A protein has these predicted regions:
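Generic structural signal for residues in well-ordered beta-strands
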Residues: 1, 80-82, 176-179
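S-adenosyl-L-methionine
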Residues: 1-26
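A general structural signal for well-ordered alpha-helical segments in protein cores
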Residues: 13-16, 38, 42, 124, ...
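Conserved SAM/SAH cofactor-binding pocket of Class I
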Residues: 21-118
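Mobile active-site "lid"/loop adjacent to the S-adenosyl-L-methionine
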Residues: 109-138
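Conserved Class I SAM-dependent methyltransferase catalytic core
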Residues: 133-190
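SAM/dcSAM-binding transferase cores
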Residues: 187-229
Length: 229
């Protein structure tokens, strides 16, 4: 089976964040995308939601510069802003003014735990895929610090880290509310997890209908295509 790539599924997570913002009628809502890479999620958020201020946080210089150029070329400087920062330092540094004020935080963090056995822990690919500069708990903690009460945190990760995600969420006051498992094709073992947490939310978890990415012929499923509309 073809492997689900991280970037293909992130719009599903993103659109759920947009639905939350629209449902609340937050014309002046704020959104932050952690591990933003080249900034595609803030750009899509600017198109799909009514958030007035959208921020992206990226640790790698090259990706950060590309994200800034994209905003400039699209004339979105009034709504979208990027910060070059490690997630562990963001809420006490450049992002201190955003603490407890954000409505929606999204995050597509590195999936692989630790640096054990890595030959080049500083390469761009390694930083993007492995927890070299920050761990899972750091991303959850940062989201909790940014969100206002009842704000929503949406994360993409691997099913193997589900327990770690839930433990970190409760540790920092983010209650898991919705969970969706994603598989490459119908009937195959899920390899992606979508989770929605709420700051100070009640203790009730809803399992959403599983999502398949590909049809038997290799094309995207209708449900996934709808995420891109």
């Amino acid at each position: 089976a073809r492997i689900v790539r991280r970037g293909q599924l992130y719009p599903q997570l993103l659109l759920r964040g947009g639905v939350v913002a629209r449902r609340r009628g937050l014309a002046d809502c704020k959104a932050v995308d952690l591990c933003t890479g080249t900034g595609i999620i803030p750009l899509i958020l600017s198109y799909k939601t009514n958030c007035s201020r959208i921020y992206g946080v990226e640790v790698q210089q090259n990706s950060y510069e590309r994200a800034v150029r994209s905003v400039q070329r699209n004339g979105l400087q009034a709504r979208v802003q990027f910060f070059r920062s490690d997630v562990k330092d963001f809420c006490s540094g450049q992002g201190v003014c955003l603490r407890d004020s954000v409505d929606v935080v999204t995050c597509n963090p590195p999936y692989t735990q630790g640096q054990g056995g890595l030959t080049n822990a500083n390469s761009a690919k390694t930083i993007a895929r492995h927890e070299t500069t920050a761990g899972l708990a750091d991303f959850v903690q940062c989201a909790a610090q940014l969100l206002k009460p009842k704000g929503s945190f949406f994360m993409v990760h691997r099913p193997a880290r589900l327990v770690d995600i839930c433990v970190a969420g409760r540790t920092y006051g983010l209650e898991p509310k919705e969970l969706c498992l994603v598989s490459p094709k119908e009937g195959e073992i899920p390899n992606i997890l979508l989770v929605h947490m709420v700051k100070g939310g009640g203790k009730e978890l809803k399992l959403l209908k599983p999502l398949a990415v590909y049809e038997a012929d290799g094309s995207f499923t209708a449900r996934l295509r709808k995420c891109y509309e």
